[in-house]
């Protein structure tokens, strides 16, 4: 490799690296004496030592070298740190660049500011130990490992001038999500997207074990990366001077390769999938730290992972820490006031070219609203409730097609899914765009192309990670998935929800577009795939998160789905969960009624009720199939008990069930009581696990009267109606539940129970003989 560093520049870069390392160690250890102007004493050291040193010097090394590359070539670049436990490093570098003080003026660029910077790290009411939202320049906390590379590619999509430097920890590289993320290069189009520069940080160890990639040999490792479609550039060593020179040359080569790839695609029309560069950086874990502590090797081992000197009961450890800190020669790095030397600070880029101040790392600054068609234009027309059937997601697909079409020029909307866009009946979008694909295309393939905006790969992890990276850098997206398999990204959802919750309290973090899930092919219509495909529990998982972040919608029909989807696409800083079926189902509300109903979140369906001013029972429902079964149960009740008074309540926004003190969408007690009454039995048919409704309503006055039916982990490959029968959610069970709970009908219970069991026997015999549901179920329609 050619030498790109003069001796003077190399010396200054090494000093900058020493400064970042000094600040990183100071954050972990010191609460006073930040410039070591006094001999170090035990009272200068924090009582609780928290943080991770091992990865940090490598992260700092890369940061100073990327800064040189940015300044030399005027690059637009952001920095994603997979091993986010190296939080002190990014805090240190954002402080050295000045952006940290711009965001937090109390952390001045002097002695007092340094002391505050050190003391606040991993301190109560201070800042967390990882690369959290509080850290300027971060879009990826890296607490839970595995998602850095997917986030990096998501950030690069539709950002043609952006380079995303993504540091992948060699421990992180062992996760399933990261392992499949290498394939993201098959979806990156150099003609219109930015570039991702993966840098595998090969320091050899995790918390207590070696890493796989560090122990398979150089040839096998480079072969692996080539097999993934990359051209690896190896930088290795433990001599700082040598590593500075080889790393600078490696980055120049990588940039030249990136520019050549993009020029070929953008100016010469080359469409062949390129072999993108990536860097393998092999340096010691805990580099520049203590060689040994108490006779045990630290640098270059797993013992450097967290706090190398973990206890100061031995007085010699204070001297050991002081020696370590003074090895960075802080007196050469900071002036008498504690300010970073001007000639060293000048190495960093300025303004928005600083990675810690790049607007792509605060995507809300760049966010533009979507151009949305009028969803009313896609409404299902009907002459009355239950007079027409429609496939809700197919109706939504037509709307999303035109959302896609309306934003093609803006290049700020993509649809994500794990090979399910057509299955989930959203394939109308393929009328205006392809599925993105940079790999080989054969004659049999349909709607594949390098310019597609539908992102399909059979990895929920990649779909979620790409979408998060896309949203965090200021764009919009929509993720559709089979309901049962969204659990695969349950932990990723956790991390994104936590990120949003934290951002709400950080004034400089601008709101981003919401993460919108559409869960379909749901539990009640997975009769053809069986028990493995039947699980509505993601709703429970989402509800556990902060009320300021999560929203859950269960539209009962296509028009309600349109209204909900339009609302979600306009929203900011939420995770919106929509659950809707794809099979033909009866439609209940015209579009204007649907909008009113969705705006309220829950309400009485007067057209399905009678005697509702003084009902015998409230028949409540949430979800499309529970709504169908509830309305069918109402018809049965009128047949069984002609003078029965029934109020039908439908819930589309699940969070209205919580009190308004617990969730901003929650109904106040007065309105809840108006809908659900204060003393009447409520039979609640719910899409998911029944105990969730009890959790949401336990503070309500009439909670003791609420009886919930829902999924109770019964299912198989069977008929659609048998699915609800197996879980006691069928119309016959709901009708029996109502009769049992109406005091004046006590004399009817025995006959009603016998009728129910006779019907169940008839149902079982019929499906066993015919393999289909009884005509009275299959051909049912609403008779108002």
From Swiss-Prot:
A Pfam family hit: XFP
Enzyme Commission identifier(s): 4.1.2.-
Leading EC class: lyase
Cofactor: thiamine diphosphate
Domain of life assignment: Bacteria
Keyword field contains Lyase: yes
One Gene Ontology MF term: aldehyde-lyase activity
Keywords of the record: Lyase, Thiamine pyrophosphate
GO biological process: carbohydrate metabolic process
Similarity comment: family membership: Belongs to the XFP family.
Name of the protein described by the UniProt record: Probable phosphoketolase
Organism, scientific name: Rhodopseudomonas palustris (strain BisB5)
